[in-house]
A protein has these predicted regions:
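Short beta-strand elements at the ligand-binding edges of bilobed clamshell
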Residues: 88, 143-168, 213-215, 281-293
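Extracellular/periplasmic bilobed ligand-binding domains
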Residues: 127, 193-293
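Extracellular/periplasmic periplasmic-binding protein-like sensory domains
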Residues: 255-331, 390, 394-403
Length: 405
């Protein structure tokens, strides 16, 4: 028995000595052999609910890339290593319910996604019942956050974009009147127009601040009558919500008439496909649009955050300096940054309940890649926004709107 003890002790000493040969200090040895086992329990799950496959998978790619890029920059949340756990909703409503339940069973501290408001709405009851906070990335349907106190978003809804463009007309352009040209029967366009009008009337104290308001049929080809009516009003800014194909057609026809008017649109105009639809006679002075992120242009100090620099550096390293990050990628990045930050602000072992409490705090605020971000009581963001134009095949910010309630 004594001989056996000697053999065991000798073996332990031999193993420790061998390990120490590769470690210059005891701290290195401790990190290599002791802390490794302890760290395996210091892991926190951030769930990702996205259409990895199916018809929407291509559209969701930038959201996912943004999340993954942020994870590479910030692999830890406080003292815990983040484990990204994906659940594929397969671009299907029924599959989303299963994917959400599967993800919830993993007990994530927070969930990110999904691309497509319809999928987030399908997952919402399960997320609400599990009391797990979630952050949608590009969902513009107001019901995503309105019907679930645990759901947040990092993008503006359509009506918010109308409000932002109203601020731009008054603050940036110093104008007191504007017009609206929108498609019939488009609820999102109507919500955007209503918010635009409210902002102008409020800021100018003028009930007649919307001097032109007219509707057209989606897919309409000739806008000569509408454009001539706009000319007669003398307004210099026209809100143009709706499909960007119609918007591009209207802007092109207005340019042919040499109209001294700037058309204002939503974030869909940042898509390169919109730029390609514009006629050769259209200049950057003919239109502006809202963007959630800007890599260059007229930026305020609120927009130039440390996280923005980290994001751009990581993006350029991964995708090259010649390319430009999309809004969706920057928003996906920020959704992860908020999740990791909220986890890091908890005490003790993080869980969904603690993270939900952090995000529900009215004083919660963070500087993300897209600027300053906090949330209102519904879970929608109060954040920096950018008024942008296409210049030399790239988007360039011409006016920054600081976060405002």
């Amino acid at each position: 028995m004594k001989t056996l003890k000697i053999i065991v002790i000798s073996t332990i000493v031999l193993v420790m000595t061998a390990g120490l040969c590769g470690c210059t200090t005891f701290d290195n040895f401790k990190a290599a052999f002791i802390d490794k086992n302890q760290d395996s329990g210091r892991e926190v799950i951030i769930g990702v609910l996205e259409p990895v496959t199916g018809s929407e998978s291509k559209n969701a790619e930038d959201e996912i890339r943004g999340i993954q890029l942020a994870n590479s920059v910030h692999p830890n949340a406080g003292d815990y290593r983040v484990s990204l756990v994906f659940s594929d909703n397969k671009s299907d409503i029924d599959a989303t319910e299963t994917a959400a339940q599967t993800l919830i069973a993993k007990e994530p501290a927070i969930i990110l996604g999904s691309y497509g408001s319809v999928y987030s709405l399908s997952a919402s009851p399960f997320i609400r019942d599990a009391k797990i906070p979630a952050i949608s990335i590009t969902n513009t349907n107001p019901l995503v956050t309105r019907n679930n106190k645990y759901y947040y978003r990092v993008c503006y809804v359509d009506s918010n974009q109308g409000d932002l463009l109203g601020r731009y007309v008054v603050e940036g352009k110093k104008e007191k009147k504007a017009g609206v040209l929108l498609p019939e029967g488009d609820d999102a366009a109507q919500a955007m127009a209503a918010a635009f009008g409210r902002r102008l009337r409020s800021e100018t104290d003028n009930d007649d601040a919307i001097a032109f308001y007219e509707q057209y049929k989606t897919g309409q080809k000739d806008f000569t009558k509408e454009l001539n009516r706009i000319k007669r009003t003398g307004v210099k800014s026209i809100l143009l919500p709706g499909e960007y194909a119609d918007a591009a057609n209207i802007i092109t026809q207005a340019a042919k008439l040499n109209m001294d008017v700037e058309f204002l649109g939503d974030t869909t105009w940042s898509d390169g496909s919109f730029r390609k639809l514009l006629g050769d006679n259209v200049t950057s002075e003919d239109y502006s649009f809202v963007q959630f992120f800007s890599s260059e242009g007229e930026l305020t100090s609120q927009a130039i955050t440390k996280e923005r620099e980290l994001f751009l550096s990581a993006y350029q390293k991964e995708y090259g300096k010649g390319s430009e990050p999309s809004d969706a990628m920057a928003l996906g990045y920020d959704a992860y940054v908020i999740a990791a930050d909220a986890i890091g602000r908890t005490t003790g072992k993080p869980d969904a309940k603690k993270v939900a409490a952090v995000l529900a705090d009215p004083g919660y605020q963070i500087e993300g890649a897209t600027g300053l971000i906090n949330f209102n009581s519904i879970g929608d963001p109060i954040k920096t926004a950018y008024i942008t134009k296409w210049k030399n095949r790239k988007t360039e910010t011409v006016y920054t709107l600081d976060a405002q309630e």
